[in-house]
């Protein structure tokens, strides 16, 4: 499983011109699911995203400006967007190979479980719409982007 996370000032997802999810400051996370992923790897990924320290600590003078706080500690939102293209192999040729991505039906079920778990761990969770043609708007803060992986 892979997640591309971005620290954002705000982000939203719309489908067919209708907003389906939005957050103010926090983390926009694109989630890619692979063949071997399961509920345990989904839970590990959510835990990693929620505890990954990508926000400055402006409270402690000794840590001023250091990336020392996570999204929960700054009361930020979490916007989860499914993104099978993160599982692409790009090492050969000039066309991505999506063979490493989980089949759509299984991925939809696992992504729903990932969302459900995230909502038990964090107050402010929004999502895109699985399998839809989504328009994602965000204002990156930094910008700070990280590619996270869990087995």
UniProtKB/Swiss-Prot annotation:
EC top class named in words: hydrolase
UniProt GO MF annotations: D-tyrosyl-tRNA(Tyr) deacylase activity; Gly-tRNA(Ala) deacylase activity; Ser(Gly)-tRNA(Ala) hydrolase activity; tRNA binding
Placement of sequence motif Gly-cisPro motif, important for rejection of L-amino acids: 142-143
Gene3D superfamilies for this protein: D-tyrosyl-tRNA(Tyr) deacylase
Catalytic reaction annotation: glycyl-tRNA(Ala) + H2O = tRNA(Ala) + glycine + H(+); a D-aminoacyl-tRNA + H2O = a tRNA + a D-alpha-amino acid + H(+)
GO aspect biological process, one term: D-amino acid catabolic process
Cellular location(s): Cytoplasm
Keyword field contains Transit peptide: no
GO CC annotations, alphabetized: cytoplasm
Keywords assigned: Cytoplasm, Hydrolase, RNA-binding, tRNA-binding
Xref: InterPro entries: Daa-tRNA_deacyls_DTD (IPR003732), DTD-like_sf (IPR023509)
A Pfam match: Tyr_Deacylase
E.C. code: 3.1.1.96
Superkingdom of source: Bacteria
Complex formation: Homodimer.
Family annotation (NCBIfam families): D-aminoacyl-tRNA deacylase
Record comment regarding domains: A Gly-cisPro motif from one monomer fits into the active site of the other monomer to allow specific chiral rejection of L-amino acids.
Reported function: An aminoacyl-tRNA editing enzyme that deacylates mischarged D-aminoacyl-tRNAs. Also deacylates mischarged glycyl-tRNA(Ala), protecting cells against glycine mischarging by AlaRS. Acts via tRNA-based rather than protein-based catalysis; rejects L-amino acids rather than detecting D-amino acids in the active site. By recycling D-aminoacyl-tRNA to D-amino acids and free tRNA molecules, this enzyme counteracts the toxicity associated with the formation of D-aminoacyl-tRNA entities in vivo and helps enforce protein L-homochirality.
Family to which the UniProt record says this protein belongs: Belongs to the DTD family.
Protein name: D-aminoacyl-tRNA deacylase
